[in-house]
Amino acid sequence: MILLISDLHLEEERPDITRAFLELLGGRARAAEALYILGDFFEVWIGDDAMTPYQLSICQALRELSDSGTQIFLMHGNRDFMLGKAFCKAAGATLLKDPSVVDFYGEPVLLMHGDSLCTRDEAYMRMRRYLRNPLSLWILRHLPLGTRRKLARKLRNESRAQTRMKANDIVDVTPDQVPQVMQEHGVRTLVHGHTHRPAIHKLQIGEQAAKRIVLGDWDRQGWALQVDEQGFQLAAFDFVPTQLALPGSP
């Protein structure tokens, strides 16, 4: 059994989401062959050298899962694209390129965060190309921590404001992009997050049936895609109501 999640947007200000994630790590994920996290794992990430005690506790929780035998794969999102090799090494995770084709029980499946499919949002795509440029990344990683924190707050606030102003179809995937990218990678199944619109969409690519599975964001409830030999099951679950102690708390 394989689990896929995305868009947890983990931050210390949302202990309910953190508790739900830790519950997943201690439960279903222990029985999984692998856990795939397809971006926006953290609400913000300014560099592996700037881990807060809270972020370090999440890293340690992932390491415990990895040490138990579950493989962990992390993909960058638009909020945490500066996650690096140091964090992944400490967490016992493998950094996965976006996009990546993986084999799930004999079927090739395309995994993406999903933001690169939203090509109608031209302003965002320009910003994405700039921020993901290797030179830009090098500069960002070498800025003073205080500057990085201010820049992260500015980008996050601007992103939230712009998203509220944009039409729904602009911030969703571009319909023509989906079959195009699936054909380019030779797959009939695409799994992505980013849009916060969980669903399984049935498609027709040429003469072949296909599907696009959109993972849900963790806000009022959690979402996980379970893959096994019987197929794909996307389901929501309620957050854990009990007041569990967070890692690192007294």
UniProtKB/Swiss-Prot annotation:
Listed GO MF terms: manganese ion binding; UDP-2,3-diacylglucosamine hydrolase activity
Named cofactor requirement(s): Mn(2+)
Entry GO terms, CC: cytoplasm; extrinsic component of plasma membrane
Gene3D superfamilies (alphabetical): 3.60.21.10
Alphabetically ordered keywords of this record: Cell inner membrane, Cell membrane, Hydrolase, Lipid A biosynthesis, Lipid biosynthesis, Lipid metabolism, Manganese, Membrane, Metal-binding
Function recorded in the entry: Hydrolyzes the pyrophosphate bond of UDP-2,3-diacylglucosamine to yield 2,3-diacylglucosamine 1-phosphate (lipid X) and UMP by catalyzing the attack of water at the alpha-P atom. Involved in the biosynthesis of lipid A, a phosphorylated glycolipid that anchors the lipopolysaccharide to the outer membrane of the cell.
HAMAP family linked to this entry: LpxH (MF_00575)
Name of the molecule in the record: UDP-2,3-diacylglucosamine hydrolase
The organism of origin for this protein: Pseudomonas fluorescens (strain ATCC BAA-477 / NRRL B-23932 / Pf-5)
